[in-house]
């Protein structure tokens, strides 16, 4: 079904250009998806811009990143178009094999991604994706499942193995089925088990995790798997917990990394 798109220009005081709020309707997800697009103030459609899909964590929404950092400043400093979709609170950005109303991976690849390419002057050779926590694992999962769509991906405190998630008996059981009976589905939807998809490619990924984060060992295991498969990966671990104060600082490293590719 062709998505319905409504575009609202959010005029920002003191900014030279508007930020766009789009509403996409699709039967692949349970409701309308609101997408916030932040363009460089100097945005000019005559030249293509690299883009970063920025995914929020569990319980968040399309505006969650704006509560941590000034997205307009990032767009201006790095000259990226920043795209913040709504992950429907706890979609984990995947296609549910048990609930046909939760097909976020298909929504992303079949609706969101092509619509953004059609509406904005994007450099299709320099599309990136990253996020925090659920958004970090979602970003890496989408990248590993569809590496041709992105130049690179990042993750900050991502759930690289869904078996380590605190939501195995709640959100993830709704999406993948009862945890005890569907361990194989939890395994197959984990980024760590999708790394083989870029084993023989020149893709270079970036991820980080705080040393006091409950997902620290999970991310260490992801790094070990990257090393085993000889995948180019930059991994940063530093003091920090699973919280906004950490992500507010860590995300800049992602933009620096992407800008140098």
Question: Where do the protein language model's features map onto the residues?
Answer:
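Compositionally biased, low-complexity segments enriched in small residues
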Residues: 1-3, 155
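Sec-dependent N-terminal signal peptides
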Residues: 3-16
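Non-catalytic cap/lid and distal C-terminal segments of serine-dependent acyl enzymes
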Residues: 19-261
